[in-house]
Amino acid sequence: MFAVIKTGGKQYRVAAGDEIRIEKLEGAAGDTLDLGDVLMLGSEAGVTVGSPTIDGAQVIGELLDTNRARKIIVFKKRRRQNYRRTKGHRQWGTVVRIAEIVAPGEKAKTALKSTTAEPKAADAPKAKAKAAPKAEKAAAPKAEKAPAKKAAAPKAAAADALTELTGVGPALATKLNEAGITTFAQVAAWTEADLDALSETITGLKAKAEKNDWINAAKALAK
């Protein structure tokens, strides 16, 4: 018997005893897991196709290992702009062995188990019980103390004219201000992660910042 399953956005044709690598699943080696939606079942009696899945069908796999695949090199280049970026990426994945394929109406012989979930649940009450006495001891002195005066709010830094940066017009400056970027010092302190985060809300920001060298320009203007 074989089955076609869907897990992690991909489809796999599997049979009992097969070892496959799929997108990362939570669990430890030795766990038995339900491997997602069953789209099709095939046997000597014929083929059953789901619409889109087969109710009652199940594919059970044993988790063997969770590791990262070989490194993939991602190279980006822009002509006539002296722009080159080389990055590596290793995708996490899980290796599983197909333990059993269960057809609708049949009872699974392999029980689902997780070696990581049960200990965490058992340890939680102990941690709470230990933390409770400390909380009670600390609560009493705080009640006796006079209420602390609220600290004065720090004065907001004066906003800079971000339009002095090449490629920043009034509309883009407004978007940056709405995102909390109001000074050259903030622009000068940008990191690669900051640019990626801002590009999610302001389209094309990272490309403009790198093309016009905003970070170095902001450092000069912030002095």
Curated annotation (Swiss-Prot):
GO terms for biological process: translation. Residues 110-149 are annotated as: Disordered. One of its GO terms (molecular function) is rRNA binding. Keywords: Ribonucleoprotein, Ribosomal protein, RNA-binding, rRNA-binding. InterPro entries: bL21-like, bL21-like_sf, DNA_repair_Rad51/TF_NusA_a-hlx, Ribosomal_bL21. It comes from the Bacteria. It holds the Pfam family Ribosomal_L21p. Residues 133-147 have a biased composition (Basic and acidic residues). Disulfide bonds: none annotated. One of its GO terms (cellular component) is ribosome. Part of the 50S ribosomal subunit. Contacts protein L20. Belongs to the bacterial ribosomal protein bL21 family. This protein binds to 23S rRNA in the presence of protein L20. NCBIfam families: L21 (TIGR00061), PRK12278.1-4 (NF008916). This is Large ribosomal subunit protein bL21. It comes from Maricaulis maris (strain MCS10). The lineage of its organism: Bacteria, Pseudomonadati, Pseudomonadota, Alphaproteobacteria, Maricaulales.
